[in-house]
Amino acid sequence: IWLLGVIGFGLLAGIIPLHGWVPQAHANASAPAAALFSTVVMKIGLLGILTLSLLGGNAPLWWGVALLVLGMITAFVGGLYALMEHNIQRLLAYHTLENIGIILLGLGAGVTGIALNQPVLIALGLTGGLYHLLNHSLFKSVLFLGAGSIWFRTGHRDIEKLGGIGKRMPVISIAMLVGLMAMAALPPLNGFAGEWVIYQSF
């Protein structure tokens, strides 16, 4: 039952290899809809996986290991796809996949801690995962709404065609810069905080 639940919720969360809908849905949706996909819909899938893992009785070790492996694959592949992308909304979608993987690493560490009866691992993994889930939702909303504003003003989503946007849209550009710095996990911004807690669990 747990495995079937992970497949179902993993499809909703966009965990690789169940991510096929994510880039197209984000690239073709309006900016507010894309922001909702990234910050609400996909996160519900992660919370569903966590709920299954916590309420499924004594979590065996392989549950945690499976979540860790899926998290590593999703984070790595999502980051690679993001590096090759020029459509700004599709790039943000692939970066969302990377962060879904990072959050899943935290949740997987917490579930592994439950199986091994390690309170520190449980606390760091679950706290880091949930904290980064919240932080990612905040800065990714800013980025998708900023990308939508840029597309509305310029008619372009191709990053290569957005040169000089800082002069045309200074306020949006500053907001996007802050969001991008958080996305890059630069301290002291919120993108750094959750990832730091997750990394402490390893």
Role assignments for model-derived ranges:
Residues 1-202:
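Hydrophobic transmembrane alpha-helices and their helix-loop junctions in integral membrane proteins
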